[in-house]
């Protein structure tokens, strides 16, 4: 009842804030879809006048390791073949580039090879690459304040926000995608986004101190980019990447309205799969395309390398996600990816010379872990995370505290077969059982939700964990406070 009441008042408040046009858009379209480019006004970035040659075909194309070798058991439904897997996973495209050869390409669920599809937050990564190019050209600096480009940001609350903060989601602006559904809806369906971002002056944290994934940050970033370059995001993309790379398909970029003409740089690009693969290949070669350095090499290396300066979230840099398994001491690959709503992915593994593209109409499991398994399987290596987690589970036990002071207790138990499971107890929660997930995370299924505890490991010691209950990487962090005493352990067990 409490949740229903909260949602009612939240939506009521949203409706009061929205203009009639924005309200009607939300009412008409509701949740975003991969075909949204058909619904909204859009600008076209034309295909290259001279498209680059098709990818080199691998010697044994369209052959991947059996699903059982790299797809976790939780994700498999019996002995599925590939066609069944594509259908059940709601995938529309799956492409694998290895050693610069097209190893695998498949389309499903009504999607055609050259058909565009909205890539949502991969748009953020594309926008960031353009900012990297502008930095290399001296048109903008990562250390430059946003107020140099948007005068409204000169107010006391926002004047400390810099380009770097927007690139790395540490701006401190009071906007968080998974928390503020109302604000995100207003941003997505607003008919004048430039006006919206200029007037959005709520700040909750000092810039550079807190990571929070927010689409608003990239839209602000795109406004700065356009002022710095004197071009729209779409025109700059055409000049700097689309034409030089010989892209096969037009790129589409939705705009808020024909009157305002603001391009949705945070999530409005619609691209064909093969051009996504070319972007992945560009990233694989650190911004170099057939001998021409299109994106500064150091901008890409900032994503790949784990050289932190204390300001960026460990799993996110320059609008790309980093696998994070390296930080947890599990795998040593320096892989990274761009991702978008409904499971759009550009996955890049420089150590294995691999790019994977996945597009779909639904994200029903954690692809970011699947891609690394596929990469290892292609190289004939074990994909069982338990092989890389020796003596890992015993360190889970302890008392953990979040930044807001909330504490939880976690203890390990064994079932009759000797398999580990854990007992979780929070301040407002009944004691719950959690089962291990692939040796890396533990979680519990409750109806259609799953809590995931993704551990942060330094050397042989557990430092804490991130709590993720939405299958996305925006996580509440709990730091290990102390071990659990024998007395505390008995008290917790007595609640059973």
Please provide the spans of the model-predicted regions.
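Active-site SXXK
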Residues: 100, 117-142, 166, 221-225, ...
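Short active-site loop at a secondary-structure junction
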Residues: 85-95, 106-139, 143-152, 157-159, ...
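N-terminal leader/targeting segments and the immediately adjacent pre-domain N-terminus
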Residues: 3-7, 16-111, 137-139, 382-384, ...
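Peripheral terminal and inter-domain segments
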Residues: 20-25, 383-496
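Active-site-proximal alpha-helical segments within enzyme catalytic domains
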Residues: 217-224, 265-289, 344-361
